[in-house]
Amino acid sequence: MVAVTRLQLPVALIGILLASLLLLLVAFSGARTADATHRSGNTFQFGCDFVKTDRIDPFKDELGITHVHRHEVFGYRNLQNSSTVTALLNGANSCGPSFVKAAYWNPLNTDAGTRNMPRRLSVYYSGWGDVNKLVHIPRGAKLYGTDEDFRCGAGQARQTPPYGCKADEFRIRVHFPECWSGNGVHPREFVEANSGGCASGYEPIPRIRVAVHYRNSGGILRKPLRVSAGADRMENWSFMHADIWEVNRQAGFRNAIERCVFKSQNTGEPHTCSPPASNQL
């Protein structure tokens, strides 16, 4: 009996180990799925030239901000704290297609105390989930994104700054909420999807991502990467965010979204909608 017991014990242990390994694989698979939150379908994308750096935030009242920090502005060329939707619609814009009228802004950043100057902004509007359920972003939507990641040159996206990056440029990418309450344009009316879909009472809108392209000052990205916050403070990179004043409801933009985004992911994209090369994302 002792001999039998000695033979059965390893078998039992092997069974336990195999079960534990299976659980780990399932957990790992779930983590990989969660990391793929931003996977999107067909995309309409364009670029915007850098406009200016200023203490500007038209959303300061909605966000409860008392001390406006320095932001880098793209898109609408005359953005002020007092700007209006009408001003954006009628004003000059630095983005590629003439029908783009939105404004985009984000805090400036430094690495090891040296300012990193923005080269340009890339903007992406993408389909996701069941594209037949997507609705247009409401005119005047005030979108606030705090979900950021980083890329060094053509390298893969990562969740933390790519310190030591020696490419000519690095990017900070910000992802925006993709679910709308249907009840106005205040930043609180837009929330992130959960478990691959919008919560009850929310409608899915195109998934938006912006990528700010920066010159790699000094030829290498050094610690610490800090961003402007408050009146004259610089904070940890985790304070990074971006804002969009979305006024793109004119015919040209609507047509681009319907042609490039509001369609099944398994249909071919028109050439004008195709994503650029990987190192441009």
For the regions a language model picked out, list residue spans one by one.
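Sec-dependent, cleavable N-terminal signal peptides
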Residues: 1-36
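Primary mode marks residue(s) on the alpha4-beta5-alpha5 output face of response regulator receiver
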Residues: 37-68, 72-174, 181-281
